[in-house]
């Protein structure tokens, strides 16, 4: 609705010819417009449209110059231009401008004058009668705009001549009296000086005998003999030779009377006759007015040096090029402003620290549908080695706040709600959180991995082992502060570098506490299945459904399995009472699980751990080198694979789980029965694993030495 009108082909040229900063008409630009319009078939229509737009300008100079351009087009562009000027659109624009009370009086008079000229020009063509109708309406609505008709040039009668002669005689008589009055005071002044020197008594009566005669003003005459100046009230254009042209406001010097209503005068070096009804008579200035005018003129001439200095400064400043005239300078100024803005914005928002990125393998298409819209994978977060603390018992409250607030998409479920599982970064997330495949039997033999933290979007975590393990991605809601995220086991064919050093971490309890093992807040809620297992690979459901397909783990380890090694001294960390706070998944509601070996879930929903003896701190587990962690891709029809399947426990030979009687916890602490005993890989209970001679096997322990805990799911 407020869209600006499209620019016409003549807008630029007409705008240049009617520039408001011009002091007079630019006839070169006007004649160029006339030539273009005369050679263009659509020129009259397009040019009149541009003229209508310029008439709407609020500057009086623009309006006057536009009328001059229209008059020049009417005289140089033929009948087609006459038809466009007599159109309803152009005449309505003229009437609207003339009837506007804010329009300057001079513009209104010029409109009336041009419409009268065009009416006289178009009167021979009946098709152009719209201009005459518009002129008649304007003259009726504004009678004061039209100047009076010039009087007839009638010769002076004898009576007129006698009246003029009488006025001339009276003026001469008054002039002589004024001269005599000026001479008498001049003669009396020299006579008063000698009489004052001889006797002051005679000077008083002589002065009293000459009363002061009042100065009588000269009566204003009505003839050319007594009137010396007149001021023009209207513009007058001569129609015959010998007439004097003048504009409104010009002061004309009267010379003589030629006709009854026409006088002869002089203006700007030109002499001619002019009608009396176009001017008003001016009274002659009094001596005081003449003296005041002379004083003002002297003041102006006294500042002639300053005037010359000002003219010099103006002429010197105009010669220098302006910045906006130079295109290169304008571009440089704009570029400098952009640079300063960018510099200021970069200083106000400094960039965050940059860390190494995870090495990503080429993704192999595997099994999960696209992720849902409400779950996102938080990027990894930087954590130093000193912050990988072993969590305290579940009954102690967490004293560390989460490293980052949970996203807005997550909601804390109630005790009976079913939360969504968490997934490894780089893997696709299932579209529905209830469609969770069970884990494979290979996941039962897993090495302890670093805990999962809530990650911040702009930071990366570099573990202390020198290698970057695959980050764990969660899409579940945060549980209460006292719960921990379940341990996520690797599944790759090569072992990643652990954040706990070259050996297992020595703990203060008789069992191995997973850094992310949760404490179930709901007694009736079972432990969740693995997020990366297919439905036919869940060790919990598979054991309950088909005991014949999954053999139980032997109670006696093979003789080829070495004893567990002691952890590195620099990575041994005691279990303090202030554990770190991690980003946890709420424990889901699921059927309680009973292990094939008889270890089941208690009434509290936690897992029973096999009692073990103390760890052997004198052996060290071998570590492979040259491994790079990568998030596992998923295949649409196959199981999920993880880079952690390359652990020695995946490559090692057969081994058996540790089982047996319980042992007291280290440091005198009672054993914690809520964890499941560690089930080593390569045993007969885990079918499908590689043979024992493919690589080093995970350390297994007899019944008294099994302090490793298996994967929670």
UniProtKB/Swiss-Prot annotation:
UniProt feature, compositional bias: Gly residues: 653-665
Pfam family, one: SH3_1
Compositionally biased residues, Low complexity: 186-195, 202-213, 442-457, 514-524, 680-704
Residue ranges of coiled coil: none
Molecular function GO terms recorded: phosphatidylinositol binding; ubiquitin binding
Membrane topology: Peripheral membrane protein
UniProt-listed Gene3D superfamilies: 1.25.40.90, SH3 Domains (2.30.30.40)
UniProt-listed GO biological process terms: protein transport to vacuole involved in ubiquitin-dependent protein catabolic process via the multivesicular body sorting pathway
Bias (Pro residues): 367-381, 399-408, 554-567
VHS domain sequence ranges: 17-146
Record localization: Endosome membrane
Family, as annotated: Belongs to the STAM family.
PANTHER family: JAK PATHWAY SIGNAL TRANSDUCTION ADAPTOR MOLECULE
Assembly and binders: Component of the ESCRT-0 complex composed of HSE1 and VPS27.
Protein name (Swiss-Prot/TrEMBL): Class E vacuolar protein-sorting machinery protein HSE1
Taxonomic lineage of the native organism: Eukaryota, Fungi, Dikarya, Ascomycota, Pezizomycotina
């Amino acid at each position: 609705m407020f869209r600006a009108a499209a620019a016409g082909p003549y807008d630029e040229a007409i705008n240049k010819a009617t520039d408001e900063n011009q002091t007079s008409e630019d006839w070169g630009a006007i004649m160029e417009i006339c030539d273009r319009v005369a050679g263009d078939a659509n020129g009259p229509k397009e040019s009149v449209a541009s003229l209508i737009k310029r008439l709407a300008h609020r500057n009086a100079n623009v309006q006057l110059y536009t009328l001059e351009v229209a008059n020049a087009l009417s005289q140089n562009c033929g009948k087609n231009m006459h038809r466009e000027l007599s159109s309803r659109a152009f005449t309505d624009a003229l009437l609207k401008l003339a009837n506007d009370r804010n329009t300057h009086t001079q513009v209104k008079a010029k409109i009336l004058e041009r419409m009268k000229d065009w009416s006289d020009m178009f009167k021979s063509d009946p098709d152009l009668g719209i201009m005459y109708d518009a002129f008649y309406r304007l003259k009726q609505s504004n009678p004061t705009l039209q100047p009076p008709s010039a009087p007839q040039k009638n010769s002076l009668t004898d009576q007129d001549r006698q009246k003029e002669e009488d006025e001339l005689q009276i003026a001469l008589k008054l002039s002589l009296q004024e001269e005599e009055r000026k001479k008498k005071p001049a003669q009396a002044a020299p006579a008063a000086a000698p009489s004052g020197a001889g006797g002051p008594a005679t000077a008083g009566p002589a002065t009293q005998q000459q009363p002061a005669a009042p100065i009588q003003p000269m009566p204003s005459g009505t003839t050319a003999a007594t009137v010396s100046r007149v001021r023009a009230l209207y513009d007058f254009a001569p129609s015959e030779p010998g007439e004097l042209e003048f504009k409104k406001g010009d002061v004309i010097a009267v010379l003589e009377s030629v006709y009854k209503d026409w006088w002869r005068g002089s203006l700007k070096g030109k002499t001619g006759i002019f009608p009396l009804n176009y001017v008003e008579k001016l009274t002659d200035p009094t001596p005081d007015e003449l003296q005041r005018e002379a004083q003002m003129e002297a003041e102006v001439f006294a500042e002639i040096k300053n005037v010359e200095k000002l003219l010099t400064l103006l002429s010197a400043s105009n010669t220098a090029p302006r910045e906006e005239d130079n295109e290169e300078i304008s571009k440089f100024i704009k570029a400098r402003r952009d640079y300063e803005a960018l510099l200021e914005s970069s200083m106000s928002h400094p960039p965050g620290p940059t860390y190494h990125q995870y090495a990503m393998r080429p993704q192999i298409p595997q099994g999960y549908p696209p992720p849902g819209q409400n779950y996102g994978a938080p990027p990894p977060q930087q954590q130093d080695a000193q912050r990988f603390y072993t969590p305290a018992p579940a009954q102690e409250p967490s004293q560390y706040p989460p490293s980052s607030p949970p996203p807005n998409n997550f909601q804390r479920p109630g005790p009976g709600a079913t939360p969504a599982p968490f997934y490894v970064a780089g893997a696709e997330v299932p579209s529905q959180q209830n469609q969770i495949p069970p884990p494979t039997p290979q996941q039962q033999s897993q090495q302890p991995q670093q805990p999962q933290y809530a990650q911040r979007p702009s930071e990366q975590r570099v573990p202390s082992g020198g290698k970057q393990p695959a980050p764990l991605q969660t899409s579940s809601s945060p549980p209460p502060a006292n719960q921990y995220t379940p341990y996520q086991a690797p599944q790759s064919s090569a072992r990643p570098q652990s954040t706990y050093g070259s050996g297992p971490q020595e703990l203060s309890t008789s069992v191995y506490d997973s850094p992310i093992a949760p404490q179930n807040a709901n007694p009736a809620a079972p432990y969740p299945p693995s997020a990366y297992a297919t439905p036919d690979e869940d060790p919990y459901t598979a054991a309950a459904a088909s005991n014949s397909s999954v053999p139980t783990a032997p109670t006696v380890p093979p003789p080829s399995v070495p004893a567990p090694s002691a952890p590195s001294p620099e990575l041994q960390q005691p279990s303090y009472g202030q554990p770190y706070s991690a980003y946890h998944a709420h424990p889901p509601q699921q059927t309680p699980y009973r292990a094939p070996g008889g270890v089941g879930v208690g009434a509290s929903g936690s897992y029973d751990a096999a009692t073990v003896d103390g760890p052997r701190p004198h052996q060290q587990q071998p570590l492979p080198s040259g491994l790079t962690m990568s998030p596992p891709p998923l295949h649409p029809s196959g199981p999920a694979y993880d880079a952690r399947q390359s652990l020695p426990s995946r490559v090692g030979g057969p081994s058996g789980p540790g089982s047996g009687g319980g042992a007291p916890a280290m440091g005198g602490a009672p054993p914690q029965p809520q964890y499941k005993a560690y089930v080593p890989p390569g045993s007969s209970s885990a079918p499908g694993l590689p043979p024992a001679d493919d690589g080093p096997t995970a350390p297994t322990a007899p019944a008294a030495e099994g302090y490793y805990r298996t994967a929670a799911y």
